[in-house]
From Swiss-Prot:
Mitochondrial S-adenosyl-L-methionine/S-adenosyl-L-homocysteine antiporter. Mediates the exchange of cytosolic S-adenosyl-L-methionine, the predominant methyl-group donor for macromolecule methylation processes, for mitochondrial S-adenosylhomocysteine(SAH), a by-product of methylation reactions. GO terms for molecular function: S-adenosyl-L-methionine transmembrane transporter activity; S-adenosyl-L-methionine:S-adenosyl-L-homocysteine antiporter activity. This is Mitochondrial S-adenosylmethionine carrier protein. It is a multi-pass membrane protein. GO terms for cellular component: mitochondrial inner membrane. Its main location: mitochondrion.
Amino acid sequence: MERRELCASLLAGGAAGMSVDLILFPLDTIKTRLQSPLGFSKSGGFRGIYAGVPSTAVGSFPNAAAFFVTYESAKRFLGSDSSYLSPIIHMAAAFLGELVACLIRVPSEVIKQRAQVSPSSTTYQMLSVTLREEGIKGLYRGYKSTVLREIPFSLVQFPLWEFLKNLWSWKQGRAVDCWQSAVCGAFAGGFAAAVTTPLDVAKTRIMLAKAGSGVANGNVLFALHEIWRTQGIMGLFAGVIPRMTMISLGGFIFLGAYDKVRSSLL
């Protein structure tokens, strides 16, 4: 990838990611509290819906930038003229992008979610408590579950987004506009969000679990089994509506803004 393309992907991805995370933060807080083992009301209800936003503000730009730089680089490296291989290339690029991005995302996500369900505590207090009680390892609690959530999500979202853009482009006989890319992103994101909600619930429970508990060990299958045993199908899909709404809107803003900013920089 040329230096100009690299910079364009970095800036476009970072700007798009920060915009989405900050605009939709209240919906993310509501979703997290619905998924909390304490329940929605005890986790804060509708109070302090911006609790944990400093963690997001710090982590969202480098997280999204890392994903898109890796994603675009991998697409270029793995590029093929065969249309049949395109979905596989997009999946592989998304997989690599998530592995890199999660190294930045997880510490930010851990502190953010703990602050979201403890609105009386500040982000700095949550960071201090986590480091004091669990060390650096505590910041990466749920790394495996986050990767196991994000990779299936991206394997659905990004190939579907690229497919819808290509289909729309073929139908109208020209490249899609940025708003059309955004619409494709909304559909792709909403669908991917719905089918991966159980993994998102498991990830939230692992990150919020008390140190030393069975769920806190990071075993996703154990967490899913516990949720199913205690709450059934409703527990596995807790927060699915705000998650779908948030990610559909996020897909519209994020992928539309990414294409717009990147094209304007190239």
